[in-house]
Every structure is written in structure tokens, then in C-alpha cells.
Curated annotation (Swiss-Prot):
One of its GO terms (cellular component) is bacterial nucleoid. This is DNA repair protein RecO. The keyword GTP-binding does not apply. HAMAP family: RecO. InterPro entries: ARFGAP/RecO (IPR037278), DNA_rep/recomb_RecO_N (IPR022572), NA-bd_OB-fold (IPR012340), RecO (IPR003717), RecO_C (IPR042242). Belongs to the RecO family. It comes from Pelotomaculum thermopropionicum (strain DSM 13744 / JCM 10971 / SI). Involved in DNA repair and RecF pathway recombination. It comes from the Bacteria. The keyword Transferase does not apply.
Length: 256
């Protein structure tokens, strides 16, 4: 069977049998991979640290009919700070679940790999909630369904009058076209400006945004509906993340 190498981030590790785990990886070279790691749960396993969720590791894998098998692995980055708070680990779990849900197996996207790596690094001390919102938009853009925010997504005209966001129409909607939208969410220009900043600013600058709780809740609603529309299902992480939805908004250095 063919051996291959992968620089990959562990999205999920599920127990399987005595001492084994089934890993879901997102790799730079091969995209999403599912692989069996034998004996890694045993206390004496040298591979144990390299297969923990949210760890970047170098893998040597053997191709199989149904599942590939981990032959060797070595941890590169472990992001220990993620395990220091429930909020950080919750958002790390969410971005990992989102990548797993949105990507097919075996289709590499190097930009997505590095975006995931960046957000895991920035969760150390950044605004986890806004980093997650920016990640959602940037992933959608990378995968080809970026929401339209500069004009009406239905008539392509200027955004004037009452403004809305429609998942079914693919973005912002003007007051004249809202009748064509299913379950539109009313927004204002401030909300759209924040969405544009989250989409266009580098992740490292997202901490400069000062966004109050009202805007955060509206943006969370919009993007959750948008992703659910494309995924056609809810993500398991939502229920856990809702526990942090009423946390005080972090202060920053720039208004939008």
C-alpha cells in the first residue's frame, strides 16, 4: 500500500476499540483525511500527543480501502493555551467542526489550511467570538459562497432604504427585493460594515474591532443562518457556544 506524508491539523479524534482512535485531519497537501491511529490512547504511546485535537503534526500515512492508517506522527504545534479556558476550547472545537462539515475528503485548499492555523494561534489571547465570525466569512469566501455585502444580492442595485440579509438570496437585500427573500433578517449599515471588516481584514487585526453585544448577537444570527442554509443542518458546537453569547463584549482600539 502507498505511503504518503501530510502536514495536518487534527480536527477530531474519536475512540475506536481498545487504544485506537479514528482521526479527522485537515492537511495542507491533501485536504481532509480520515485515518485510523492504532494504540495511540495507551499511556506508553509515543504518538499520543501528536493526535490530540487542535494539534498540528507531521504524519506518515498508509492508504487503505476504507480508512488510511497512521504509520508515524510527530507533533509540531500543540496550542496548549486553548485548553486553559472553556471558551477557547469551545471556539477551537467550533472552527474544527466547521472545516470538517464544509470540506470534502481529498480536496486540498492550502489557503484554508493556513487560515485554520492562524485562527488557532490567535485564539490564545484574541477576541474569540469575533475571530470565529471572521473565520466563518473567510471560509465561505474561500469555498465559493461568500455573501454579497456591497450591493443587493437580488437586483444587484445599490443598498438603499430598509436593509436586510437573506441566506437564500446570498447576502444583503434592499427594501424593494425583500419580498423575494425567505426568512430575511433586518440589518443596518453598521452591521454590514462590521461584516465587511470581518471578511476583509486580516485575522490579526480583528481584535481592533470594538463591537457591542447588540451587533454581536445580530451578526451571530446572520452567519449562523447563512451557514446552516449551506450546510443544511446545525452544528453540534452551537449549543455549547451559546453559553458564551451573553458575555461582555471585549474592548478594542477601533470602531467600525
Amino acid at each position: 500500500m502507498k505511503l504518503y506524508k501530510a502536514d495536518a491539523i487534527v480536527l477530531r479524534a474519536r475512540d475506536c476499540g481498545e487504544g485506537d482512535k479514528i482521526l479527522t485531519l485537515y492537511s495542507r497537501e491533501h485536504g481532509r483525511i480520515k485515518a485510523m491511529a492504532h494504540g495511540v490512547s495507551k499511556p506508553t504511546s509515543r504518538k499520543r500527543g501528536a493526535v490530540q485535537p487542535f494539534t498540528r503534526s507531521r504524519f506518515l500515512l498508509r492508504r487503505g480501502r476504507e480508512l488510511d492508517t497512521v504509520s508515524q506522527c510527530e507533533g509540531v504545534e500543540t496550542f496548549p493555551f486553548l485548553r486553559e479556558s472553556l471558551e477557547r476550547i469551545g471556539y477551537a472545537s467550533y472552527v474544527a467542526e466547521l472545516v470538517e462539515a464544509l470540506t470534502p475528503e481529498g480536496e486540498p485548499n492550502e489557503s484554508l489550511f493556513f487560515l485554520l492555523l492562524d485562527v488557532l494561534r490567535l485564539l490564545a489571547g484574541g477576541d474569540a467570538e469575533m475571530l470565529a465570525r471572521a473565520f466563518e466569512l473567510k471560509v465561505a469566501a474561500l469555498l465559493g459562497y461568500c455573501p454579497v455585502l456591497e450591493r443587493c444580492s437580488h437586483c444587484q442595485g445599490a443598498l438603499a432604504g430598509p436593509l436586510f440579509f437573506s441566506s437564500s438570496l446570498g447576502g444583503a437585500v434592499c427594501g424593494l427585493c425583500v419580498a423575494f427573500a425567505a426568512n430575511p433578517v433586518e440589518v443596518n449599515k453598521g452591521t454590514l460594515e462590521i461584516l465587511k471588516a470581518l471578511l476583509n481584514w486580516p485575522l490579526a487585526r480583528i481584535g481592533l474591532l470594538r463591537v457591542n453585544r447588540r451587533f454581536r448577537n445580530r451578526i451571530r444570527l446572520i452567519l449562523r443562518q447563512y451557514l446552516t442554509y449551506h450546510l443544511e443542518r446545525d452544528l453540534k458546537s452551537y449549543a455549547f457556544l451559546d453559553r458564551f453569547g451573553q458575555a461582555p463584549a471585549g474592548s478594542g482600539a477601533a470602531d467600525v
